[in-house]
């Protein structure tokens, strides 16, 4: 070979190693995806499982790599039909195999060139050259092993080539070589052992250079502990001194990578194991550390069995086989416990490191090496555990299950976050280091070189100039640094000075190599911090161990002490995209989706766990709040009364009931209650949720706190509805006051969450409670508004209509009446002032408005029925309207009326509903006056100062505003709206108006019939009648006001007409002699007074003109006297 060929600068070893290593990873990615696709029935090429092609595939595989298309027409007939589709769909697979073959050719060529050049390899001197050389060999080896694991490789290649032959009349030009390669590498390691015989010298030299690096890295946890490894505070006096080493890049070199180099490397050049004790010791040490190696992603290689199978057929290798068996036994027995102790040490070491750096981030400058060493060590241990999790020995399974792995990952993430956050601090430090120290030392080294060729001199001078020109101002100005060119030049220089005939041999100038390696590390601290983090702490391998990943997460959540570190798992999902490669862009989407789904699942589970803890705390607090309800004090009062009256309280020895609050009395601080445990667990988990405000995974931003907020909203909604304890079958429901107490207790707990997590709990309250004021929530589920509205309408008010409950104006509540069938609830406990106020607090103005609208709908249906009754009696009522001053004629006409009792009953129902509404409105006004007094007073001013001449539309708008605030109005806007919707298209407005007038006439002339009802007796104690006819006053006034507002009539005139008719009709019963007909005459007389008192349009003077006041006075006297008599 001529001298020009051997010129190192012309061989471009550095460039070729860089390109081939990158291309090798790309090829591994593509092969890995082909293997996974072929192993998945859903993703497998359809031609491999097509029943029609089954015989053809079997024939092709059997004959592979030979091609026979002429004599097998029957078997290949189906193939002929689908040849174009096969060519199209298998092209990607086929040309990937072709690319692997070409890659192999390039690697073999480069390895031959390196052998010819007799390149010197030493990981401690020419680090980049040696590392890239060893990486290339391992990538090549892994590629061929992975290729041999694709079972369908012959079928794919053969199918494609047969389709090509049928289409083009000849085989693909690459097929003969490709087919032969597939056959040759059936047993890849065996073939490569033969292939690497000429490369043994170079490879063994590179591997033996690890003798100072690998054993130092592969120490036990006790040795690390004794050496105070990674500790910044073990020697405070040297804390500010820069962490230095002669082999800087070797300090954070992956142990996993070194073990692959050693194990595969010495298998390929196995001869050295018999002649060199150092090589043998290295190999045995690596074999004792693991049971399997990671080939690529989740593809593992069982080293002991494979090595034994390879050596068993080699003569004279019995000793090596025994060594392998001994190492296997050592690995099975001791590797698990050794790595467990390492992880235990690293947890405490990384915690210390992260804590010190968070307090003094300036130490990231001098101690940056410690950070990357810590990350690399921890990453190696995690990957070791991950690949052994599915390959663990049964004897020591506990060593392979680490429930504290989350803590280690968390501290790794914390260190990564420090590096990203304080990058500029590190840049300032190392820019000064490079310009003020490294440039000076390198310049001296170069000056002292005895021989320095021109090319090498130019490169090193450029190094010095580049470093000298650096300044802190560049960092302050935010200038982007880029030392990639300088690092590539050093890589080239390593190649130039490591060949056998180099004028300047790096082997003779080791100090130069070590100094340059240190400088390269310093440059990376300025411009490649992100790349350094990926190199030393990338855990994207978890993407391919989904089951183990999820299991670790579940273990983390189940252990309360570890739940604070659970955020580490979603953070790991941010690593996943770093495992993609540009040679396989099609997998980016798949890996991206997986990272998103896992991140989403982890955050969702964390939020659910926190939500469940909060729910448990809320349940406990609701129970404690429930103990303070007034209903629970009855027993205490009873005991006090009995004690005062010196009565026996019960049997001796009866335990005294614990009073609320006793749970807060602690006799011993060691006693931990269930509530304490829940709060501790919650604070731990919330620390994790609050750890980062957001994280970016594949260009998607995740906000952990929003997950918690979302879950709290959903659970709070369900809890509020659940706490109503509504039972549709039995029509039971919680009292509003009790629900309000529970909701307030729940809200108090939720507010305390803000002490743990920075979430806007007020937003949660607004979203949930506002939805509860509507008929349905955002998920279409019923709310407390709809539940309580239905209950009051369908249960309470229906029982009022059935005569089981009466409205007591004196108590402002509905009260159960004594009946044969006792009701399941006490109406007073649901309708008194405190309960209605609680209801108003819960439902708010919107909910109360919905309640009112529902009540009005029921009223409108009753009015519709009343109008039908009026239409039936329209002629009689028309005559009665004009004949009220003719008693005989009125009596005759009254007898012709039908459905008198129905009219009164329906009007009473309307009155009851309106009475209930007035209670609700009053409660709403009280609640709003407490919460927003100034706004309510402003609304009152609007309402009280509407000029009489104001347009009715304007007035109705003011009334609507006032009604929403719970203020009583002369005309009820909700009732007007409800009755307006009843207008019939077939009836003219004049006719509608006439029906409205006649309805009032009907009610007026029907009132005397009430006197004959036994239940119509007025009770002064309740200020009403037990059959609720006192509610007629409200019904008459509000129905009249609404109807005549709709029909634009005079409300006052119509009510005067009503009063005249009613008084005339009632005066007639004064002349009746039948005691049955007049038994409650005085009680019915009082209705007139109630109607006038209730009306804003009628006056007592007007009543006096129609009905003598003396009769009213006597009526009041009579009913009170009767009440006293009946009480006695």
Swiss-Prot record:
Q: Which residues cross the membrane?
A: 995-1015
Tissue localization of expression is:
Expressed in all tissues examined except peripheral blood leukocytes, with highest expression in brain, heart, and skeletal muscle. Expressed in cells of various brain regions including Purkinje cells and dentate nucleus of the cerebellum, CA4 region and dentate gyrus of the hippocampus, and in frontal gray and white matter.
Transmembrane: present as a keyword of the record?
Answer: yes
Comp. bias intervals (Basic and acidic residues): 651-665
- Would you tell me the Gene Ontology cellular component terms? cytosol; extracellular exosome; filamentous actin; focal adhesion; lamellipodium; lamellipodium membrane; postsynapse; ruffle
Q: Give the way it sits in the membrane.
A: Single-pass membrane protein
Question: From what superkingdom does this record's organism come?
Answer: Eukaryota
Where on the chain is N-acetylserine found, per UniProt?
A: 2
Q: Where in the cell is it found?
A: Cell membrane; Cell projection, Lamellipodium membrane
- Annotated spans, Disordered: 640-665
Q: Name one GO biological process term.
A: paraxial mesoderm morphogenesis
Assembly, per entry: Component of the WAVE1 complex composed of ABI2, CYFIP1 or CYFIP2, BRK1, NCKAP1 and WASF1/WAVE1. Within the complex, a heterodimer containing NCKAP1 and CYFIP1 interacts with a heterotrimer formed by WAVE1, ABI2 and BRK1. Component of the WAVE2 complex composed of ABI1, CYFIP1/SRA1, NCKAP1/NAP1 and WASF2/WAVE2. CYFIP2 binds to activated RAC1 which causes the complex to dissociate, releasing activated WASF1. The complex can also be activated by NCK1. Associates preferentially with the first SH3 domain of NCK. Interacts with NYAP1, NYAP2 and MYO16. Interacts with TMEM132D.
The family line of this record is: Belongs to the HEM-1/HEM-2 family.
The task this protein performs is described as: Part of the WAVE complex that regulates lamellipodia formation. The WAVE complex regulates actin filament reorganization via its interaction with the Arp2/3 complex. Actin remodeling activity is regulated by RAC1. As component of the WAVE1 complex, required for BDNF-NTRK2 endocytic trafficking and signaling from early endosomes.
Under what name is this protein listed? Nck-associated protein 1
| Gene designation | NCKAP1
């Amino acid at each position: 070979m001529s001298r020009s060929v051997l010129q190192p600068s012309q061989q471009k070893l550095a460039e070729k190693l860089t390109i081939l290593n990158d291309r090798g990873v790309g090829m591994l990615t593509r092969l890995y995806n082909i293997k996974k696709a072929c192993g998945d029935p859903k993703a497998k090429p359809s031609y491999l499982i097509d029943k029609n092609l089954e015989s053809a595939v079997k024939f092709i595989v059997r004959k592979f790599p030979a091609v026979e298309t002429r004599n097998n027409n029957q078997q290949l007939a189906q193939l002929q039909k689908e040849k174009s589709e096969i060519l199209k769909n298998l092209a990607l697979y086929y040309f990937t195999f072709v690319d692997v073959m070409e890659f192999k050719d390039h690697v073999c060529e480069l390895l031959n060139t390196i052998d010819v050049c007799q390149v010197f390899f030493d990981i401690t001197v020419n680090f980049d050259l040696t590392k890239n050389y060893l990486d290339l060999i391992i990538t090549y080896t892994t590629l061929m092993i992975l290729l041999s694991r694709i079972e369908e490789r012959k079928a794919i290649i053969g199918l494609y080539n047969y389709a090509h032959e049928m289409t083009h009349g000849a085989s693909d030009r690459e097929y003969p070589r490709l087919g032969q390669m597939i056959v040759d590498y059936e047993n890849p390691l065996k073939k490569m052992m033969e292939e690497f015989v000429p490369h043994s010298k170079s490879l063994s030299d590179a591997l033996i250079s690890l003798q100072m690096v690998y054993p130092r890295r592969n120490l036990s946890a006790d040795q690390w502990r004794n050496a105070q490894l990674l500790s910044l505070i073990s020697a405070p006096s040297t804390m500010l001194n820069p962490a230095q080493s002669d082999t800087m890049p070797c300090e954070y070199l992956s142990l996993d990578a070194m073990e692959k180099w050693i194990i595969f490397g010495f298998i390929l050049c196995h001869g050295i194991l018999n002649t060199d004790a150092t090589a043998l010791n290295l190999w045995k040490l690596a074999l004792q550390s693991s049971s399997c190696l990671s080939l690529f992603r989740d593809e593992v290689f069982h080293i002991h069995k494979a090595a034994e199978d390879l050596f068993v057929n080699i003569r004279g290798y019995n000793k090596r086989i025994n060594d392998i068996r001994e190492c296997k036994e050592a690995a099975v027995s001791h590797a698990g416990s050794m790595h467990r102790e390492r992880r235990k040490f690293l947890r405490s070491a990384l915690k210390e490191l992260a804590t010190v750096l968070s307090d003094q981030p300036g130490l990231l400058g001098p101690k940056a090496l410690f950070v990357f060493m810590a990350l690399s060590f921890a990453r190696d241990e995690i990957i070791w555990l991950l690949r052994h999790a599915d390959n663990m020995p049964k004897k020591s399974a506990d060593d392979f299950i680490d429930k504290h792995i989350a803590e280690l990952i968390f501290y790794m993430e914390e260190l990564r976050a420090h590096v990203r956050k304080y990058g500029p601090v590190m840049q300032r430090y190392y820019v000064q280091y490079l310009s003020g120290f490294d440039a000076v030392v390198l310049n001296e080294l170069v000056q002292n070189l005895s021989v320095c060729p021109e090319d090498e001199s130019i490169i090193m001078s450029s190094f010095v100039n580049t470093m000298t020109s650096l300044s802190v101002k560049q960092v302050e100005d935010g200038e982007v640094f880029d030392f990639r060119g300088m690092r590539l030049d050093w890589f080239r220089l390593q190649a130039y000075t490591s060949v056998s005939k180099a004028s300047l041999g790096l082997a003779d100038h080791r100090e130069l190599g070590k100094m340059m390696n240190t400088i390269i590390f310093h440059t990376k601290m300025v411009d490649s911090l992100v790349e350094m983090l990926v190199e030393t702490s990338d855990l994207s391998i978890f993407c391919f161990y989904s089951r183990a990943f999820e299991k670790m997460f579940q273990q983390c959540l189940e252990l309360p002490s570890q739940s604070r570190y659970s955020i580490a798992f979603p953070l790991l999902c941010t690593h996943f995209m770093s495992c993609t490669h540009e040679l396989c862009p099609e997998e980016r989407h798949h890996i991206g989706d997986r990272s998103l789904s896992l991140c989403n699942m982890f955050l969702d589970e964390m939020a659910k766990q926190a939500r469940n803890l909060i729910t448990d705390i809320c349940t406990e607090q609701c129970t404690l709040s429930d103990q303070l309800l007034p209903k629970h004090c009855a027993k205490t009062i009873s005991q006090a009364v009995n004690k005062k009256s010196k009565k026996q309280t019960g049997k001796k020895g009866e335990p005294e009931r614990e009073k609320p609050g006793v749970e807060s009395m602690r006799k011993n601080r060691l006693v931990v209650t269930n509530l304490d445990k829940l709060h501790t667990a919650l604070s731990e988990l919330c620390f994790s949720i609050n750890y980062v405000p957001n994280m970016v995974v594949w260009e998607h931003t995740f906000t952990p706190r929003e997950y918690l907020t979302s879950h709290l909203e959903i659970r709070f909604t369900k809890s509020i509805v659940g706490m109503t304890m509504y039972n549709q079958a039995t029509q039971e429901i919680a009292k509003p006051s009790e629900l309000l107490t529970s909701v307030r207790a729940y809200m108090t707990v939720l507010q305390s969450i803000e002490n743990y997590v920075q979430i806007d709990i007020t937003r949660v309250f607004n979203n949930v409670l506002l939805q509860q004021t509507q008929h349905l929530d955002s998920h279409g589920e019923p709310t407390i508004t709809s539940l309580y509205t239905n209950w009051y309408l369908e249960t309470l008010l229906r029982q009022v209509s059935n005569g089981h409950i009466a409205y007591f104006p004196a108590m402002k509540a509905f009260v159960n009446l004594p009946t044969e069938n006792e009701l399941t609830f006490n109406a007073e406990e649901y309708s008194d002032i405190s309960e209605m106020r609680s209801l108003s607090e819960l439902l708010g103005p919107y909910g109360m408005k919905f309640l009112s609208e529902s009540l009005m709908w029921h009223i409108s249906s009753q009015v519709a029925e009343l109008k039908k009754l009026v239409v039936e009696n329209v002629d009689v009522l028309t005559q009665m309207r004009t004949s009220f001053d003719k008693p005989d004629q009125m009596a005759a006409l009254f007898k012709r009326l039908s459905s008198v009792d129905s009219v009164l009953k329906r009007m009473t129902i309307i009155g009851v509903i309106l009475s209930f509404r007035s209670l609700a409105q009053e409660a709403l006004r009280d609640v709003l006056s407490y919460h927003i007094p100034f706004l309510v007073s402003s609304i009152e001013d609007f309402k009280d100062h509407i000029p009489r001449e104001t347009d009715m539309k304007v007035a109705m708008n003011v009334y609507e505003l006032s009604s929403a605030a719970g203020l009583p109005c002369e005309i009820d806007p909700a009732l007007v709206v409800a009755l307006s919707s009843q207008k019939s298209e077939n009836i003219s407005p004049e006719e509608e108006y006439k029906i409205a007038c006649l309805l009032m006439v009907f009610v007026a002339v029907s009132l005397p019939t009430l006197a004959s009802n036994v239940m119509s007796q007025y009770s002064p104690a309740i200020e009403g009648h037990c059959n609720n006819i006192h509610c007629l006053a409200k019904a008459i006034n509000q129905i009249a006001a609404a109807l005549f507002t709709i029909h634009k009539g005079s409300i006052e005139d119509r009510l005067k007409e009503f009063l005249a008719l009613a008084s005339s009709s009632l005066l007639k019963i004064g002349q009746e002699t039948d005691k049955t007909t007049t038994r409650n005459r005085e009680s019915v007389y009082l209705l007139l007074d109630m109607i006038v008192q209730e009306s804003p349009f009628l006056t007592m003077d007007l009543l006096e003109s129609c009905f003598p006041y003396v009769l009213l006075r006597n009526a009041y006297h009579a009913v009170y006297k009767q009440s006293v008599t009946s009480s006695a």
